[in-house]
Amino acid sequence: MERFLENVMYASRWLLAPVYFGLSLALIALALKFFQDILHVLPNVFALAEADLILVLLSLVDMTLVGGLLVMVMFSGYENFVSQLDISAGKEKLNWLGKMDATSLKNKVAASIVAISSIHLLRVFMDAKNVPDNKLMWYVIIHLTFVLSAFVMGYLDRLTRHNH
C-alpha cells in the first residue's frame, strides 16, 4: 500500500505539466499585447509628448520583465518539479537550465517582482499629478514590502546555506 501511494504521489507531479504549458499560452498573450501596444504607438510617435512616450516604453519594459519571469518560472518549475527538459545537443540551451533549484528560483522571482514593481512605481510617479496622495503612499508601501521581502528571503537563504 505504501509503495502504491508513493508511486501515485510521484506520478501526480505530471499534473503540473499542463499548468506550465498554460504559462506558455500566457506568454503568447503577453507577446500579442506587447506588439499591439507597439503597433498602436508607432503611427502616433511624433505626436506623442515625451512623457507619454516614456510611459508607453515603461509599459513595454514591464511586459518584457513579466515575460522573462514567465519563462523562468515555466522552465525552472518544470525541471524542478516535473521532469528534465530533453533538449538535443545541437540545439541552443539556456545556460541556467538545470542549474536553478527551487530556492534560486524563488530568489530570482522575488528580484523580478521588485524590478516589475519598480517599473510600475516609476510609471505611477511620472503621472503623479493625476494620482491621489494616499494612493501614491500605498504604491510606495507595497513596493517597499516587495523589496523588504526579497531582501529577507535572500538573507535567510544565505544563512541556511552558510549553516549547512
Swiss-Prot record:
What are the subcellular locations of this protein?
Cell membrane
Provenance organism: Salmonella dublin (strain CT_02021853)
| Protein name, as recorded | UPF0114 protein YqhA
Q: Name one Pfam family in it.
A: UPF0114
The family this protein is said to belong to: Belongs to the UPF0114 family.
Extract the NCBIfam families matched here.
HI0507
Q: Which residues cross the membrane?
A: 15-35, 53-73, 136-156
Look up and give the membrane topology term.
Multi-pass membrane protein
InterPro entries for the chain:
UPF0114, UPF0114_bac
Instruction: One GO cellular component term, please give it.
Output: plasma membrane
Q: Which UniProt keywords apply?
A: Cell membrane, Membrane, Transmembrane, Transmembrane helix
Question: Is Signal one of the keywords?
Answer: no
Origin organism lineage: Bacteria, Pseudomonadati, Pseudomonadota, Gammaproteobacteria, Enterobacterales
Domain of life, source organism: Bacteria
